[in-house]
């Protein structure tokens, strides 16, 4: 019988690396130059050490031909899942308004 395993949230940088850079043969440095940002920014995103900001989302979407919302939504989903994990059962103590009356 398989154990229930909770997968950690996937950082948008992992998506950037695994779904875009690696398959397309684009280096982090090449991407940074193409979208006019410091190479360190791309490296930190790829390593999960930096968020994808609106500025970066606009640049990535232009370069890869995706929507801006694609990148922003990846980051928002990651942020929500990470925060949900951090809060743990603390949210269980909050009664919804409809149940509070």
Briefly describe each language-model feature range.
Residues 38, 49, 64, 75-78:
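The DNA-recognition helices of helix-turn-helix-type DNA-binding domains
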């Amino acid at each position: 019988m398989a154990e229930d395993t909770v997968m950690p949230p996937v950082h948008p940088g992992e998506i950037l690396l695994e779904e875009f850079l690696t398959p397309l043969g684009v280096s982090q440095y090449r991407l940074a130059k193409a979208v006019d940002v410091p190479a360190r920014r791309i490296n930190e995103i790829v390593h999960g050490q930096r968020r994808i900001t609106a500025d970066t989302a606009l640049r990535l979407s232009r370069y890869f031909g995706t929507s801006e919302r694609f990148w922003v939504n990846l980051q928002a989903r990651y942020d929500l899942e990470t925060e949900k994990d951090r809060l743990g059962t603390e949210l269980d103590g909050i009664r919804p308004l409809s149940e509070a009356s």
